[in-house]
């Protein structure tokens, strides 16, 4: 059976309003990630959310008085349609890595996006070289990673490609891309869930 594009899956979920469940399900991890990253930023800051879904993180960032601009990008037409309806930023429909923003940003946030790419570590290099301003910060959260054994069945059960990397591979990928002050941390831990792997670093 041919593996389907992840954006098709997310469009189906948006039509069934599962984006709202994704928002509530990821909120704890994202809040912890923002609490890590925002104090690292030079203010005021511009931000882009990669894999923005219905734009809920963009709206959260826009409510921050120190956020001067926020942009969201997603490959799902239904998710972007919802994001534009709800407002709270500029939203673009595009698939990565074949799209580059017209400006660089101080903050790149991504939740549950990178492992859907065939080469997510190459995307980290693109973020570093083409998307991020000097002194900028990237933080990315992934629930599908080697140490989260329960996530190993997701590619088969959803019939979607996922790149499975270990915590150390993600950390080294950030270093190889050029980031400094690279750290990984488990966030959103709760009973029955080992946590979202948050990977973050700075462009000096």
Residue ranges and their predicted role:
Residues 1-40, 146-147:
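Conserved class I S-adenosyl-L-methionine
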Residues 48-98:
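Class I SAM-dependent methyltransferase SAM/SAH-binding core
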Residues 109:
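A conserved beta-strand element that flanks and buttresses the S-adenosyl-L-methionine
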Residues 117-127:
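A short, conserved alpha-helix within the catalytic core of class I
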Residues 135-143:
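Conserved beta-strand signature within the Rossmann-like core of class I S-adenosyl-L-methionine
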Residues 143-161:
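Short, glycine-/aromatic-enriched active-site segment of Class I SAM-dependent methyltransferases
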Residues 162-178:
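Short alpha-helix
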Residues 186-204:
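Core SAM-dependent methyltransferase catalytic element
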């Amino acid at each position: 059976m041919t593996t389907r594009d992840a954006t098709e899956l997310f469009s189906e979920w948006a039509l069934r309003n599962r984006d709202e469940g994704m928002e509530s399900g990821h909120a704890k991890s994202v809040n912890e990630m923002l609490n890590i990253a925002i104090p690292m930023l030079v203010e005021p800051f511009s931000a882009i959310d990669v894999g923005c879904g219905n734009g809920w993180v963009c709206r959260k960032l826009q409510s921050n008085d120190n956020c001067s601009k926020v942009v969201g990008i997603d490959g799902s037409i239904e998710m972007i349609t919802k994001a534009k309806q709800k407002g709270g930023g500029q939203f673009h429909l595009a698939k990565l890595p074949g799209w580059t923003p017209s400006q660089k940003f101080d903050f790149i946030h991504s939740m549950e996006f990178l492992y859907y790419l065939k080469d997510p570590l190459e995307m980290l290099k693109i973020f570093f070289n083409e998307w991020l301003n000097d002194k900028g910060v990237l933080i990315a959260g992934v629930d599908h990673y080697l140490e989260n054994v329960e996530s190993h069945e997701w590619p088969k059960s959803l019939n979607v490609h996922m790149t499975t990397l270990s915590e150390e591979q993600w950390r080294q990928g950030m270093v190889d891309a050029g980031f400094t002050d690279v750290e990984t941390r488990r966030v959103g831990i709760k009973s029955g869930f080992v946590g979202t792997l948050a990977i973050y670093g700075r462009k000096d």
